[in-house]
Amino acid sequence: PAEHAIRGLRGIALWVEDAAGTAQVLSEVLGHEPGPVEGNRSRFVHPGAGLGRIVDLRAVPGFWAGAMGAGVVHHVAFRAADDAAQAAATAALAARGIRVTPQQDRTYFRSTYFREPGGVLFEIATDAPGFAIDEPVAALGSRLMLPARYEPHRAAIEANLPRLHPAHDTA
């Protein structure tokens, strides 16, 4: 039912060897405000309303770093209102000696990527142009939309996706 639909994530938890550099990037570059500290967990909150504003940062010396595989998160994405906000973040990162990828056009948004000092891969993605560039807002999520470069591979992509059964689907 719609009342049980996933509408977003409350926040994320990052476990890093040394949290100091990550904390600086979160607060000085990405605009998160330091919040309460409990033991080895420091909370950072992005100002404003909505989901995805909380980052819980844990300093866990000696913790085994993640390895790619099923169930492992590849990267964490943060929002940038537009190209100018993304460029400002990129400049702030470069001033700290952090290498950032060139901007990547992902059709629905534009992204840059960097490894923050704790080793986690971060993405900064623009809000624009948005997911309504190739279908009406009312139709979002009703069928699989693909960027033009992936359309030739639609059959193979769809063959590898599990069938979803939306609440309104009686099949």
Place the predicted regions along the sequence by residue.
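Glyoxalase I/VOC metalloenzyme domain signal
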Residues: 1-38, 46-101, 115-171
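Short hydrophobic/aromatic beta-strand or adjacent loop that forms the aromatic wall/cage
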Residues: 41
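Short secondary-structure boundary/hinge segments and terminal tails
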Residues: 44-45, 111
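Short acidic/glycine-enriched loop/turn segments that link adjacent beta-strands
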Residues: 106-110
